[in-house]
């Protein structure tokens, strides 16, 4: 199950660099993080759902690539995003 439109709109509004920004790495990483967190809750009840687990691993990999890109482009934005999302505990 994916995120609903209201949740996505709230995440986009919070992490967007400018009005109407949906493609910046910050927004993409925030949306992926929300989906990953949602799926982790799903796996608490459905341990043997291997098809969804593959999707989860794909999202984690995609998020890692976007974070690596952002880290190479602008370290300050990367560190701010990591802190805001609570990653790298």
UniProtKB/Swiss-Prot annotation:
Keywords: Ribonucleoprotein, Ribosomal protein, RNA-binding, rRNA-binding
GO function term, MF aspect, one: rRNA binding
UniProt keyword Ubl conjugation present: no
GO biological process terms, semicolon-separated: translation
Entry superkingdom: Bacteria
Protein family according to the UniProt entry: Belongs to the universal ribosomal protein uS15 family.
Subunit structure, interactors included: Part of the 30S ribosomal subunit. Forms a bridge to the 50S subunit in the 70S ribosome, contacting the 23S rRNA.
PANTHER family per the UniProt record, alphabetical: RIBOSOMAL PROTEIN S15, BACTERIAL AND ORGANELLAR, SMALL RIBOSOMAL SUBUNIT PROTEIN US15M
Entry function: One of the primary rRNA binding proteins, it binds directly to 16S rRNA where it helps nucleate assembly of the platform of the 30S subunit by binding and bridging several RNA helices of the 16S rRNA. Forms an intersubunit bridge (bridge B4) with the 23S rRNA of the 50S subunit in the ribosome.
Protein name per its UniProtKB record: Small ribosomal subunit protein uS15
Species annotation: Aliivibrio fischeri (strain ATCC 700601 / ES114) (Vibrio fischeri)
Gene from which the chain derives: rpsO
